[in-house]
Amino acid sequence: MEAKAIAKYVRMSPTKVGVVLDLIRGKNVNEAFAILKYTPRDAAEVISKVLKSAVANAENNHELDANRLFVAEAHVGHGPTLKRFRPMDHGKAFRINKRTSNITLVVKERA
């Protein structure tokens, strides 16, 4: 059995989120929380919330044991990009892309 949690439209670049997701993919849930706690990146805090939600979904909706869970899938997708313009010299404008991410975590119980 598996449980899933999704965070949509997180105001963070998918590239930066993906680096942190690579650290926890395949790990035990307790080990993943420990890794995220000491990872000095902003994405770690958001991913920790999503992981906590996935564990809660597993316990409450599927009645799985939290101590036997591991991160089966962890991936990030591109959300909509907010486009902003920065004024430059000589009347030019420079486009700034503020990227968003859709984070998906799936936890399963070890056999």
From Swiss-Prot:
For the keyword Transferase, the answer is no
Which molecular function GO terms apply here? rRNA binding; structural constituent of ribosome
* GO BP field: translation
Q: Which SUPFAM superfamilies match?
A: Ribosomal protein L22 (SSF54843)
What InterPro entries would the database entry show?
Ribosomal_uL22, Ribosomal_uL22_bac/chlpt-type, Ribosomal_uL22_bac/org-type, Ribosomal_uL22_sf
- GO CC term (a single one): cytosolic large ribosomal subunit
Q: Which UniProt keywords apply?
A: Ribonucleoprotein, Ribosomal protein, RNA-binding, rRNA-binding
Pfam families registered for this protein in UniProt: Ribosomal_L22 (PF00237)
Record text on subunit structure and interactions: Part of the 50S ribosomal subunit.
The text of the family note is:
Belongs to the universal ribosomal protein uL22 family.
Main function: This protein binds specifically to 23S rRNA; its binding is stimulated by other ribosomal proteins, e.g. L4, L17, and L20. It is important during the early stages of 50S assembly. It makes multiple contacts with different domains of the 23S rRNA in the assembled 50S subunit and ribosome.
What is the protein name given in its UniProt record? Large ribosomal subunit protein uL22
State the organism of origin.
Answer: Clostridium perfringens (strain 13 / Type A)
